[in-house]
Every structure is written in structure tokens, then in C-alpha cells.
């Protein structure tokens, strides 16, 4: 891969690099910018991660740079790791001394020794991340590429600098990183490297769930996430990190009737949705929307394959999966549960005559997330029949139009009935009890069904009439 030397210089002419150069020469240490920042110069990608390796003490170099940057610089030293960080405004520099590493079989924590630049490049995960640019004045901007990282970028290839079995056994997270880079960059994984991932897949079990989720999130947020999940499936990692997604694979046939491969369908939905949103948790909703289909799959000789209530069962499965995978057990989880629970509703609406009542109930149940729900449901139309797709999308358009009209007229999104439980108890001198709940629910349903408008006077009159049928008399 050719890139003009002037282009390289353009990326390392800023004041921070000049200061690092001066400080390194004063300390008589070699200093290099290495890793992702250099890689992204050649890929013409913006990058804020600036990693500096010093052949000597990275901490001492960081201290010298911080002094030169003055009062605006904030220095953090991590002595146990032999690293330091310098922050000044938006600038963030990471410093480390060149080192060589070795690992024990059951840990990602390396045994670290001082080393040369070559040692440091040897320990890098992939050849494209082992590129280094010298910052010392006499060799300023000189590229050090011992493993053919530039050639691999030219060939769009992810490859390890050393024996991939050693690389992945030493640090199994690198298997996830290989797949993540391939997904983000649109690269291929070198066959020997990919085969080594398959051989070492079980080693992923020593990696913390949090680190795995960090990589999965980056895959989910990539332009075409299906690439990553296909690779995770093909190398055998997927059953270790997300067995419920892996369980969607396969097609079963009975009496000549088959069903679609729900794994392939899920990835197609995810890709389609990714074209319309960068919302991480909405994209995760695509991965979870059919997660209960294996548990609900039944064959009916009259109906064929059914997956009854897979949306409700899926909603109930989510907390256990989130807990196991160390996904957040907070509003984000509840949001995904809502998306999974409701994802069949707009499709049902689009497949039949759309009533005002059904629209009101959808607006009420989905609340502020109704637009996200519609995006998910539109992405869920993956039929190979173009006429069917066209019909569904046209019906979705009508659903959206009707939603807009009803929302403006009835204000039912996130609405609370105009009559509260407290007012019901006060009106009829009731303690907290079933009749209070029955009346409140009846008022809500009357509004959603269009029996009464979403207004206090109408709701109050409806309450009195319904209460009379329940032999309840107001005390005021």
C-alpha cells in the first residue's frame, strides 16, 4: 500500500508530536507512535487514540511531555502496569515502555519484561496494528513495518504477527478483536489465523464477560453487523458467548414443510435495521426479537410450523440472558424487553384493517419508543416475495399515518387516565382494593377504545356510570 510521505507527515506535525520528539531526544530514548493511530493514517480513517511506545521508560517520557505541555496537562501514572496517560483538553496520549510479554495458560495477565521495539511489535495482536512511526528528530516519520502490515492492509487481511495459536492462546480476547476488526473495516481474516481461532475457541471462557460485551457492542454498531456474527458462528465462538442466538440456527422439515432459518433471518433484520439507526440497544433488540423461537417451535399438521407467544416468552428470557452476559440490568434491558414483547403488534396491524382502537393501544403500550418499534418491525419484513414486502410496507405507511392523526387528536402516547386511583378511593370511600383497579382499568380501556375522549369530564361521568353497575355509590 502506497501513501505519500507528506501525507504521513501531515498526521504527525501537530504540537503534541513535536513535544514528544523533543522530550524523547532530551531523554535519549527512542519514541514511536504505534498501533491504531498509524493504521488509520493508511486507511484514511479519523483516529483519536494516540499510543506512544518508548524504548526505555514510558512513564519518564510521559512526565517530560506533561511538563512541556504545562499547566493544562494532566498526568496519570499506572506504575503497576508501567504505563502513563497525559490529557490536555481533547488530547489524550497513552505511554508505555517497549516490552515483551508471556502468558500462563489460565490467565490473560502477562509476565512483562523490558524489551526492544521489535519485542513490542511482536506482542501486538495483528500486523495492521504493529505499524510504528518514529518520532525522534533524526528519523522523524520513518515507518517500521516488520510484519508486512501495509501489504495486509492492501489485501484487506487480518493476520497475527506471530504464530496465531500462540497469539490467541496467550490472549483469547484477540479472537473477538480479529472478528470485530474484520467487521468494522470490511477485511478478511487470514485462513491460518481463522483456523487458529476455531482451534482456540474454548479459551474464550477465561475472558471476562464485560470484555466480550465491549467487543460485541462494537460489532453490533458496525455498518454490517451480520459479518461479525457469521464469523463468530463459523469459527465456533458463538455458542460460548451467545448460545441462545446460536440456537436459532437451522431448518427443520416435517411432512415436506420447512421453516426459515431464524439465525439468518435475525442477522438480516439486524443489517436492515442498521441502515436506519445507530441506536445500540435498538440494534440489540433485533438480535433478541426472535430469541424464543426455538423454545416455542411446534409443528401443526394443519398450520405447519408455529412459534406461538415467542414474543412474550422472549421478553421473559431476556433478564436471565442479560445477567449471564453482563449486559446492563437497567432501563436498557427494559427497553429491549418492550421491543421484543411488542414487535408482533405493528405487523398484525399491517396485515389487517387498522382500527383506531388498535392504534391507540399500540401508542399507549409503546409510548415514546413507538418510532423505534416501527423501525424494528419494518426491518423484520424479510420475505423473498417482493409483492408481499411491498404490501406490508405500504400498510406500515398507513399505520404510521393513522398513528400521527390519532396521536394529535387523542394524546394517548404515555397517557395516564384523567382519573387517578386516589380520586376513585376518595369518591367512593374505598380502601386500596380490587374495585379501584377495575374502575381505573375500565376508564383506560374506554379511552383507548374510543368510547370516551381523553378528557376529565368524560372520564368522571364514565366512572360514575360504571361504578353504579358495580353497586358503588359516591359519597360526594
Region spans (language model):
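Catalytic cores of the polymerase beta-like nucleotidyltransferase superfamily
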Residues: 1-476
Amino acid at each position: 500500500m502506497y501513501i505519500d510521505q507528506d501525507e504521513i507527515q501531515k498526521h504527525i506535525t501537530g504540537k503534541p508530536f513535536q513535544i514528544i520528539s523533543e522530550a524523547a531526544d532530551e531523554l535519549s530514548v527512542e519514541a514511536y507512535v504505534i498501533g491504531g493511530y498509524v493504521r488509520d493514517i493508511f486507511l484514511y480513517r479519523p483516529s483519536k487514540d494516540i499510543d506512544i511506545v518508548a524504548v526505555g521508560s514510558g512513564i519518564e517520557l510521559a512526565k517530560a511531555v506533561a511538563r512541556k505541555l504545562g499547566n493544562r496537562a494532566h498526568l496519570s501514572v499506572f506504575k503497576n502496569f508501567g504505563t502513563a496517560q497525559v490529557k490536555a483538553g481533547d488530547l489524550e496520549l497513552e505511554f508505555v515502555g517497549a516490552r515483551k510479554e508471556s502468558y500462563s495458560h489460565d490467565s490473560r495477565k502477562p509476565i512483562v519484561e523490558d524489551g526492544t521495539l521489535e519485542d513490542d511489535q511482536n506482542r501486538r495482536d495483528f500486523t495492521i496494528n504493529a505499524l510504528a512511526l518514529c518520532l525522534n528528530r533524526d528519523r522523524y516519520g520513518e515507518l517500521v513495518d516488520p510484519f508486512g502490515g501495509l501489504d495486509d492492509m492492501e489485501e484487506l487481511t487480518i493476520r497475527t504477527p506471530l504464530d496465531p495459536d500462540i497469539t490467541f492462546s496467550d490472549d483469547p480476547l484477540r479472537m473477538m478483536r480479529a472478528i470485530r476488526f474484520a467487521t468494522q473495516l470490511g477485511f478478511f481474516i487470514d485462513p491460518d489465523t481463522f483456523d487458529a481461532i476455531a482451534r482456540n475457541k474454548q479459551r474464550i471462557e477465561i475472558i471476562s464477560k464485560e470484555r466480550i460485551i465491549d467487543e460485541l457492542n462494537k460489532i453490533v454498531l458496525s455498518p454490517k453487523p451480520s459479518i461479525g456474527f457469521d464469523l463468530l458462528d463459523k469459527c465456533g465462538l458463538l455458542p460460548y458467548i451467545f448460545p441462545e442466538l446460536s440456537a436459532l440456527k437451522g431448518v427443520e422439515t416435517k411432512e415436506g414443510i420447512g421453516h426459515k432459518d431464524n439465525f439468518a433471518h435475525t442477522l438480516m433484520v439486524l443489517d436492515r435495521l442498521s441502515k436506519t439507526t445507530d441506536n445500540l440497544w435498538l440494534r440489540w433488540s433485533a438480535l433478541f426479537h426472535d430469541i424464543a423461537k426455538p423454545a416455542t417451535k411446534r409443528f401443526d399438521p394443519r398450520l405447519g410450523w408455529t412459534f406461538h407467544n415467542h414474543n412474550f416468552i422472549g421478553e421473559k428470557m431476556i433478564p436471565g440472558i442479560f445477567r449471564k452476559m453482563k449486559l446492563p440490568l437497567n432501563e436498557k434491558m427494559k427497553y429491549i424487553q418492550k421491543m421484543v414483547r411488542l414487535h408482533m403488534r405493528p405487523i398484525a396491524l399491517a396485515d389487517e384493517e387498522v382500527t383506531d382502537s388498535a392504534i391507540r393501544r399500540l401508542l399507549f403500550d409503546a409510548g415514546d419508543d413507538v418510532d423505534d418499534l416501527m423501525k424494528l418491525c419494518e426491518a423484520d419484513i424479510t420475505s423473498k416475495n417482493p409483492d408481499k414486502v411491498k404490501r406490508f410496507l405500504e400498510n406500515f405507511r398507513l399505520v404510521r399515518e393513522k398513528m400521527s392523526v390519532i396521536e394529535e387528536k387523542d394524546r394517548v402516547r404515555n397517557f395516564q387516565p384523567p382519573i387517578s386511583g386516589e380520586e376513585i378511593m376518595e369518591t367512593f370511600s374505598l380502601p386500596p382494593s380490587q374495585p379501584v383497579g377495575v374502575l381505573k382499568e375500565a376508564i383506560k380501556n374506554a379511552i383507548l377504545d374510543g368510547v370516551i375522549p381523553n378528557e376529565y369530564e368524560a372520564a368522571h361521568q364514565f366512572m360514575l356510570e360504571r361504578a353504579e353497575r358495580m353497586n358503588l355509590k359516591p359519597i360526594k
